[in-house]
Amino acid sequence: MKKQEQLSINSKIEFAMGKYNYVFCNTPDDKMPPKIRLNHCQAWTQDFAGFTVLWSYNTTVAVYDKIYCTLYDVLRCVYGYTATSAKHIAKFRNMYNPAHVLTYREV
């Protein structure tokens, strides 16, 4: 993949995360959807209007956009790479079977 292509993907991911952060930050605590455990892992999913979030431990590592059937893998953006969180994302991806998967990578 060329540098420009990855920069374009990173830009799309940052835009999607901006939408997610807006909804998350503007949802009152009493209206916050419950976290549901992913299999028997230290990972949870949380459904919001239009998207589902994957939390690995206490970090948002992926966002699935239900409208566009796109999975945004933000692990490397928010934390760096860990094998455990990558496994959580793989399970999450298999659960939703998205049409598109976009992965944030440093350029």
State where each predicted segment sits.
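Terminal leader/tail segments of proteins
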Residues: 1-107
